[in-house]
Amino acid sequence: MEKIVKFDLKYDELLKKIPYKYAIPVVVAKRAEAIREYARPFVITDDENYVSIAFMELSLNYIRIKNEEILKALIPKVK
């Protein structure tokens, strides 16, 4: 039997793993749209909100950001 995931979103902890604060909502929105349209969620949960499910998947490393090297180039170097 598969475990039902309970989840409390901590955006600050997510930013420690993925330091691109503007990329996170885009990735989550795209994944939520995919779940709504055709994809099955990677986590089993009672939550029916697609955005919450996508945040769970990102936080639990079921999905990741592609081309992270390109995003690293966009981080400003502050002196």
Swiss-Prot record:
State the family it belongs to.
Answer: Belongs to the RNA polymerase subunit omega family.
- Which InterPro entries does UniProt cross-reference here? DNA-dir_RNA_pol_omega (IPR003716), Pol_omega/Rpo6/RPB6 (IPR006110), RPB6/omega-like_sf (IPR036161)
Enzyme nomenclature, EC number: 2.7.7.6
MF annotations from Gene Ontology = DNA binding; DNA-directed RNA polymerase activity
**Role according to the record:** Promotes RNA polymerase assembly. Latches the N- and C-terminal regions of the beta' subunit thereby facilitating its interaction with the beta and alpha subunits.
Chemical reaction(s) catalysed: RNA(n) + a ribonucleoside 5'-triphosphate = RNA(n+1) + diphosphate
Instruction: Keywords in alphabetical order, please.
Output: DNA-directed RNA polymerase, Nucleotidyltransferase, Transcription, Transferase
Tell me if Acetylation is a UniProt keyword of this record.
no
Q: By its UniProt entry, which SMART domains does this protein fall under? A: RNA_pol_Rpb6 (SM01409)
HAMAP family xref list? RNApol_bact_RpoZ
Report the SS bond pairs: none
UniProt keyword annotation of Transmembrane present:
no
- Please give the name of this protein: DNA-directed RNA polymerase subunit omega
* Assembly and oligomerization: The RNAP catalytic core consists of 2 alpha, 1 beta, 1 beta' and 1 omega subunit. When a sigma factor is associated with the core the holoenzyme is formed, which can initiate transcription.
Q: Which Pfam families match?
A: RNA_pol_Rpb6
